[in-house]
């Protein structure tokens, strides 16, 4: 018997908010009786932006800023209709992007 699974990928700039969201999703999914595998930490994307400090000259004086995107993967095995309904109603913070694949 092939088991169905739902993959939930969360992204965010603050790892603490992403981890809190994962805990909310796990509690909601386990409340419906579904098995949860994860959270699996995925590689963190790091984007570095370099700008000149001076307006006109002094090219040797630069400043770097970085932006990190933290990602987590969660698998829910054999999700039911109740599991999907509960996951639609979970309130997540505004700094978290969620992607669900069946």
Curated annotation (Swiss-Prot):
UniProt-listed Pfam families: Ribosomal_S10
GO terms for MF: structural constituent of ribosome; tRNA binding
GO biological process: translation
Gene Ontology cellular component annotations, sorted alphabetically: ribonucleoprotein complex; ribosome
Keywords in alphabetical order: Ribonucleoprotein, Ribosomal protein
Keyword Transmembrane part of the UniProt annotation: no
Residue ranges crossing the lipid bilayer per the database entry: none
Function per UniProt: Involved in the binding of tRNA to the ribosomes.
Summary of subunit composition and partner proteins: Part of the 30S ribosomal subunit.
UniProt cross-references to HAMAP family, sorted A to Z: Ribosomal_uS10
Similarity-based family: Belongs to the universal ribosomal protein uS10 family.
Protein name (record): Small ribosomal subunit protein uS10
């Amino acid at each position: 018997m092939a088991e169905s699974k739902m993959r939930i990928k969360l992204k965010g700039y603050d790892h603490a908010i992403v981890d809190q969201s994962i805990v909310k999703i796990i509690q909601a999914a386990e409340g419906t009786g579904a098995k949860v595998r994860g959270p699996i930490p995925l590689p963190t994307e790091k984007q570095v932006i370099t700008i000149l400090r001076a307006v006109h000259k002094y090219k040797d004086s630069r400043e770097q800023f970085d932006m990190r995107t933290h990602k987590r993967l969660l698998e829910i095995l054999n999700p039911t209709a109740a599991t999907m309904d509960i996951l639609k109603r979970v309130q997540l913070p505004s700094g978290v992007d969620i992607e669900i694949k069946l």
